[in-house]
């Protein structure tokens, strides 16, 4: 039987992907162990830097990450590195609000081309960032390169919302990091909780250039989706969930190859989780680094 082709890592032309979600933490060193307990393979610690306008080393951005990479999308965990920078201050401000998910990144083929559209939509995006991150490879270290276009925090209170263009996807999605004990294949969705669902969805639509769509509470993308719920509706998607602040990114969803195997792994490792009636597994709180992580069988709805 012919193998089903894997989805392309990055979008083409006018496509928009849900690229990755980011959890903010105050301290990165313990993260790899926490991800490993959940069954994720993690990338090594990597500091972020902004490419200089002239020759020289990248300027530290004040943050670093550890990631779990999937065949579609990834989960990023970010923490401070000690420098006093605008990005580090934003991370600290978000952590004071609540721990957990604070970043949604959408990937596009050409971030700079979206600047004029975002200006016209009233977002006044900050200057384009030429982000650099050193990554290990089997042949030594290399520099992963990204263009990142962020909108000002005041315009998107849900978190750090950005458009990213990958210039070196093969360095980011290295095959040795794509297999996970918990069977995760793809990042499939983000769940946003807001008082005014329609207004929040409309803003995300303007950021991504996807204003239309038949589903009023869902922003459908070429890969992945963002769903929106009110506080009163949150328990339908996340039973036992609490609301730390509004609006907020409530959960990340992951498709797994065999949900029963994921369930066995979590039980064997003593990871507290909710086994829902519709077959999803939800890990929240400290075990999920302050976030809510939803595992669902590949091909099923992440939020039910």
Predicted regions and their residues:
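Glyoxalase I/VOC metalloenzyme domain signal
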Residues: 1-19, 23-43, 59-130, 136-304
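A short beta-strand-loop structural module common to alpha/beta enzyme folds
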Residues: 43-50
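Membrane-anchoring hydrophobic segments
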Residues: 50-51, 60
């Amino acid at each position: 039987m012919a193998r089903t082709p894997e989805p392309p890592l990055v979008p083409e032309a006018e496509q928009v992907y849900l690229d990755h979600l980011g959890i903010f933490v105050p301290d990165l060193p313990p993260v790899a162990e926490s991800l490993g307990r959940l069954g994720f393979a993690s990338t090594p610690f990597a500091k972020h830097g902004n490419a200089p306008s002239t020759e020289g080393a990248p300027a530290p951005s004040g943050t670093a990450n550890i990631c779990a990479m999937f065949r579609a999308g990834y989960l990023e965990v970010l923490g401070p590195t000690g420098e006093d920078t605008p990005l580090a201050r934003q991370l600290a401000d978000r952590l004071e609000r609540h721990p957990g998910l604070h970043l949604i990144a959408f990937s596009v083929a050409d971030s700079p081309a979206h600047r004029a559209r975002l200006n016209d939509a009233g977002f006044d995006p900050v200057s384009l960032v030429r982000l650099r991150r050193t990554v290990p490879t089997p042949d030594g270290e290399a520099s992963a390169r990204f263009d990142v276009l962020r909108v000002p925090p005041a315009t998107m209170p849900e978190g750090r919302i950005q458009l990213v263009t990958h210039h070196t996807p093969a360095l980011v999605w290295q095959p040795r990091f794509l297999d996970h004990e918990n069977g995760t294949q793809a990042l499939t969705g983000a769940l946003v909780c807001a008082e005014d669902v329609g207004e929040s969805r409309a803003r995300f639509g303007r950021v991504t250039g996807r204003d239309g769509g038949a589903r009023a509470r869902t922003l459908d993308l070429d890969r992945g989706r963002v769903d929106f719920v009110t506080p009163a509706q949150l328990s339908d998607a996340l039973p036992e969930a609490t609301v730390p602040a509004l609006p907020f990114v409530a959960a990340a969803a992951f498709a797994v190859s065999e949900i029963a195997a994921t369930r066995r792994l979590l039980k064997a490792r003593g990871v507290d989780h909710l086994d829902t009636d519709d077959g999803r597994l939800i890990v929240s709180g400290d075990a999920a680094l302050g976030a809510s992580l939803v595992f669902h069988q590949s091909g099923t709805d992440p939020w039910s």
